[in-house]
């Protein structure tokens, strides 16, 4: 495994502090909202926390997507990406996504919080849960 960035204990603690945020977003928005927390320490298996991964079959240890890799340059100055649409490798489901940069005390990007909303879920199901 190749390190992308050397992380401090503080960096690890900052990323861990996002676990309950991911859980809270999922509790509010339901099973159709996938939340993936990525650490930029190891890009090959950057996903360190996944909620509702059944939407894209992502799990802990999954790598950054190509879109997230391309976002690295823009996230040096921006904190939140523009919303974008993606599909999984098999073409389903259609998801609307946003990527949020996570910074350490030196303002270096150390991770991403990616929110992916499954748009194939009927509105009635979204409102019911």
Language-model region placement:
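Structured interaction and signal-relay segments at domain junctions
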Residues: 22-84, 88-90
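Sensory/regulatory domains in signal-transduction proteins
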Residues: 63, 67-125
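Short linear functional motifs in flexible/disordered or boundary regions
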Residues: 37, 47, 109-110, 127
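Juxtadomain coupling helices with adjacent low-complexity linkers
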Residues: 2-28, 111-112, 117-129
């Amino acid at each position: 495994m190749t390190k992308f960035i050397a992380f401090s204990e503080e960096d690890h603690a900052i990323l861990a502090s996002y676990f309950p945020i991911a859980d809270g977003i999922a509790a509010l928005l339901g099973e159709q909202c996938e939340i993936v927390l990525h650490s930029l320490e190891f890009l090959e298996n950057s996903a360190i926390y996944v909620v509702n991964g059944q939407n894209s079959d992502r799990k802990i240890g999954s790598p950054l997507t190509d879109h997230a890799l391309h976002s690295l340059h823009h996230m040096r100055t921006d904190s939140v990406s523009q919303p974008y649409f993606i599909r999984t490798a098999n073409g389903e489901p259609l998801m609307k996504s946003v990527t949020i940069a996570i910074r350490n005390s030196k303002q270096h990007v150390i991770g991403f919080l990616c929110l992916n909303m499954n748009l194939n879920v009927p509105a009635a199901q979204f409102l019911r849960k």
